[in-house]
């Protein structure tokens, strides 16, 4: 019986921190993805990058190839690159066959036009490997409800 944990909440409440600590404490083999906004970037639009969940923070590189979007003005302004989710996000989810837990940090509104990635998320949730996911607490993250039997 699969057991997934989806942690929902507003920005800054500690969803990602909780996931990181749970994985570290349990010493699990991890697959999946993490997205992270570059808070130190200059300009009004902050870049957001996607990384393999297994990659240590100090080894994460930022470049156009893993740029999934830019946000500004508390999410009211956004520029999203669904092709990065479709290519990298999907690959990170499909490469999880030997993992003990799949991390999805985080799921939100930015994936709305990334159809291949959304399908990969739903397929992962239909799988047997436990998922630990951070989910933005927003009305426009409805694609997770499409999965029928998914949590």
Ranges and model annotations:
Residues 70-122:
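Phosphate-binding/switch loop-helix module in NTP-utilizing enzymes
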Residues 15:
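Conserved lysine of the Walker
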Residues 25-26, 95-96, 127:
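Alpha-helix C-cap/termination motif
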Residues 1-4:
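Extreme N-terminal starter segment of soluble prokaryotic enzymes
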């Amino acid at each position: 019986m699969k057991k997934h944990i989806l942690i929902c909440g507003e920005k800054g409440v500690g969803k990602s921190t909780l996931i990181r600590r749970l994985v570290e404490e349990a010493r699990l083999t991890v697959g999946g993805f993490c997205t992270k906004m570059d808070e130190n970037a200059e300009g009004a639009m902050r870049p957001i990058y996607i990384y393999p969940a297994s990659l240590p923070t100090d080894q994460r590189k930022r470049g156009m190839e893993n740029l999934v979007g830019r946000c500004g003005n508390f999410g009211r302004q956004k520029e999203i690159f669904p092709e990065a989710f479709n290519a990298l996000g999907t690959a990170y989810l499909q490469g999880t066959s030997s993992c003990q837990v799949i991390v999805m940090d985080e799921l939100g509104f930015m994936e709305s036009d990334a159809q291949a990635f959304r399908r990969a998320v739903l397929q992962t949730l239909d799988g047997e490997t436990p998922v630990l996911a951070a989910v933005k607490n927003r009305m426009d993250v409805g694609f997770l409800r499409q999965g029928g039997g998914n949590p």
